[in-house]
A protein has these predicted regions:
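Bacterial N-terminal signal peptides
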Residues: 20-33
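A "functional boundary" signal
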Residues: 2, 8-12, 25, 36-333
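N-terminal Sec-pathway targeting helices
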Residues: 14-19
Length: 333
C-alpha cells in the first residue's frame, strides 16, 4: 500500500474543495435571487388578487383587470392562478355567463391543489347551480365544499393571515349561498339554520360579506320571531344597516340590492306606510330626491335599476325591473 505524505493529502483535499464547493458558492446567490424573485412575484400577484376581490361588488371591470394582471405575474404559482380564476368566475356569474363561469371553476380543479381555492371554486359552482336550478349538481358541490371545510379546519392553525382572511370569505359565502338556495326551493327552516351558524363578529374583517349578512336577514324569510309588524321592522333595520355599510364602502352592487329590497318592503300594505311613519330618520336618509311617500318605493326601484345597469349584473337588473313594475302597478300606472 502506497503511503501518502500528509502535505500532499492536504493539497489534494484543497483541490477537491476548490472544484466542488467554489462552483456551488457561485450558484447560491443566483438560487437565492430566483427564490427572492419568486416571493416578490407571488406578493405582487397576491396584491392584484386582493384588489380584484376588493372590487367584487364595486366594479366588475376592475375585478377582471386585476385578476388578469395577477395571472400575468403569477410565475406558475398554482394557488395564485386558482385564486385569479375564481375571481374571473365570480365576474362571469354576475354577468350570467354561466358556461364561462363553470369552465373557469373546472380549470381551478385541474390547475391547483390549494384547498382554499378549491373550496372557493366549489362554492362558486354552488351559486351557478342555484342560478341554473340544477339541484343534484348543487348538492354535489355543497357536500364537496363541506368536506373541504372540515379538512381545512383540521389545519386552521397553520394558515397564514392572508389565508385566514380568505377563509372568512369562503366560510361565510358557503353559508350565504346555501341559505339562498334553500330559501328559493322552499326550505325555510334549513335556510335560517345554515346562516345562523355565523354572526356579524365573524365577518368583522370583510365588509362585503358583512353587508351580505345583513342583507340576507333583511330581504325576508329568515326572521320568524314576533308579530308580522315586529318582523317587518326587524327586516327594515337589517336592510338599513346593510345600506349604510354599502354607502360607506361605496359598494355599487349592495347599494342597489338594498334599495331594491327597501322598495319591496315599502310596497307592502299596510306595512310600508307604517315603516315610513315609524322610521322618519331612516326614510329621510334613503329619500335623497325628496319624493312623496306614494312614489318613494318606485324611486328606490328606479335608482336600484340604474345602479345595476351601471354595475353590469343582468340577473339583479331583472329583479329591479320586476320590483319597478310592481311599483307602477301599485299607483295604477
Amino acid at each position: 500500500m502506497i503511503k501518502v505524505e500528509p502535505k500532499y493529502l492536504f493539497l489534494a483535499r484543497r483541490r477537491i474543495l476548490r472544484r466542488v464547493l467554489l462552483p456551488l458558492f457561485a450558484v447560491l446567490p443566483t438560487v437565492a435571487g430566483l427564490v427572492g424573485c419568486g416571493d416578490q412575484a407571488t406578493q405582487e400577484a397576491d396584491h392584484y388578487n386582493d384588489l380584484a376581490y376588493y372590487y367584487h361588488y364595486r366594479s366588475l371591470d376592475s375585478t377582471t383587470a386585476y385578476a388578469r394582471r395577477a395571472l400575468q405575474v403569477a410565475r406558475g404559482d398554482d394557488g395564485v392562478i386558482g385564486e385569479s380564476l375564481n375571481n374571473l368566475a365570480f365576474v362571469a356569474i354576475m354577468r350570467m355567463d354561466f358556461p364561462r363561469a363553470k369552465q373557469l371553476c373546472d380549470s381551478v380543479n385541474t390547475i391547483t391543489d390549494d384547498q382554499i381555492e378549491l373550496l372557493v371554486s366549489d362554492i362558486l359552482q354552488m351559486r351557478i347551480c342555484q342560478r341554473e336550478s340544477r339541484n343534484k349538481d348543487f348538492y354535489d358541490s355543497y357536500q364537496q365544499a363541506a368536506q373541504r371545510l372540515r379538512r381545512i379546519d383540521e389545519t386552521s392553525l397553520e394558515l397564514t393571515p392572508r389565508q385566514q382572511r380568505r377563509m372568512v370569505y369562503a366560510r361565510s359565502e358557503y353559508r350565504i349561498v346555501a341559505s339562498a338556495y334553500f330559501y328559493y326551493v322552499g326550505l325555510d327552516r334549513q335556510s335560517a339554520q345554515v346562516i345562523s351558524g355565523m354572526g356579524e363578529e365573524d365577518l368583522a374583517s370583510d365588509t362585503a360579506q358583512l353587508i351580505n349578512y345583513w342583507y340576507c336577514y333583511g330581504a325576508g324569510g329568515l326572521l320568524t320571531k314576533g308579530s308580522r309588524e315586529e318582523i317587518y321592522q326587524q327586516e327594515f333595520d337589517c336592510l338599513m344597516r346593510a345600506y349604510r355599510l354599502a354607502m360607506e364602502s361605496r359598494s355599487t352592487f349592495w347599494i342597489a340590492n338594498t334599495l331594491q329590497a327597501l322598495s319591496e318592503h315599502l310596497l307592502q300594505r299596510p306595512d310600508g306606510p307604517r315603516l315610513m311613519a315609524d322610521n322618519p330618520r331612516d326614510i329621510r336618509l334613503i329619500n335623497t330626491d325628496a319624493m312623496p311617500d306614494s312614489l318613494l318605493a318606485g324611486n328606490l326601484a328606479e335608482r336600484s335599476l340604474h345602479l345595476f345597469r351601471q354595475f353590469g349584473d343582468i340577473y339583479q337588473k331583472a329583479g329591479s325591473l320586476r320590483t319597478l313594475a310592481n311599483c307602477y302597478w301599485q299607483i295604477d300606472d
